[in-house]
Amino acid sequence: MSDEIVTNKSVTYVNNTTPVTITXSELDLRSCYQDDEVVIEVHAAALNPIDFITHQLCNSYIFGKYPKTYSRDYSGVIIKAGKDVDNRWKVGDKVNGMYSHIYGERGTLTHYLILNPAKDIPITHMVEVPKDENDPYDDFVYAAAWPLTFGTAFSTLYDFKKDWTSDSKVLVIGASTSVSYAFVHIAKNYFNIGTVVGICSKNSIERNKKLGYDYLVPYDEGSIVENVKKLKQIVLENDKFDMIXDSVGNHDFFPVIDQFLKPKAKNSFYVTIAGNNKANYKNISWRDFVSLSSILKAINPFKKYNWRFGHPYPPNNFIEVGNEMIKKGTYKPPIDSVYEFDQYKEAIDRLMSNRAKGKVVVKMK
């Protein structure tokens, strides 16, 4: 067999009745790409909740019976480039990015990823992550760990509210998630937001203090609402929040939202990336994300506050902001654990456990 003909192994599923598995296909590296595409040999890919959420929601009658590949975040090396590809993307370049798809035959938990760098954005050249001598991870692991979560956090802060100042105040529900990790670093180091309050378990408070939160409130010691209310009255001089960002799925503040969120006229926002209820990742249903209450909050013209569903928005240039923050040392992608390719099931189980503190990454090389 020619060296240009390789076996491409990918982690795939067909629908929500089939398990995730490794499938293999023959790939001719001489002809598998178009003139405007590149072939990336993937070194690492990160898992995100969207991976097993889409798996569990995949009805074969609606979404077909073809293999669908896991993951969106990736890092790797360009090994082929079509003749019409912009010359900023060359063979040998180390790149990372987010390959957006819902039920794509192409995904990033694969050994070879084919994409159009002009359309399949964001993609960027990898930057070196500042590391100490005992750091166990290489740059490919770090590079795969941040695009989707960083992009979600940046888009939440950038796309809805434009007038952040040192007097601004933000409440983060779910301070320990990877999105919230990026959120607090972006809020403090890029937008220079004055006060960021986080809600997390009492056991996570010491860890999260080091991330840049100004104040932390436990959700497992009394009422969340009452605990935040006390902080607001005693420490924040009863000032309300410019944004409440929810990364876990919560509805506790809705009945008393006017006590915590500034008026709609002041350009305040409630932004969720997880819906109004915490999802059980082992038993996902469409109702967890497309509930009647969520729809009403989104379309109700009479509600007294701005409610939005957050998601990464590649055109806002978050990938370059992330690169700059990484180079400056103001953001370092958090890694929970790293698995080899054939340990993909353990990696998925780790993320589904809700115990991961940082990104779960799978290595191909």
UniProtKB/Swiss-Prot annotation:
Keyword Lyase found: no
Keyword Mitochondrion in annotation: yes
Subcellular location: Lipid droplet; Mitochondrion
InterPro entries xref list: ADH-like_N (IPR013154), GroES-like_sf (IPR011032), NAD(P)-bd_dom_sf (IPR036291), YIM1/Zinc_Alcohol_DH_Fams (IPR050700)
CDD domains in the cross-refs: AST1_like
UniProt superkingdom: Eukaryota
Record's keyword terms, sorted: Lipid droplet, Mitochondrion
GO CC annotation, single: mitochondrion
One Pfam match: ADH_zinc_N_2
Main localization of the protein described in the UniProt heading: other
PANTHER family per the UniProt record, alphabetical: ALCOHOL DEHYDROGENASE RELATED (PTHR11695), RETICULON-4-INTERACTING PROTEIN 1, MITOCHONDRIAL (PTHR11695:SF294)
Similarity comment text for this entry: Belongs to the YIM1 family.
UniProt protein name: Protein YIM1
Phylogenetic classification of the source organism: Eukaryota, Fungi, Dikarya, Ascomycota, Saccharomycotina
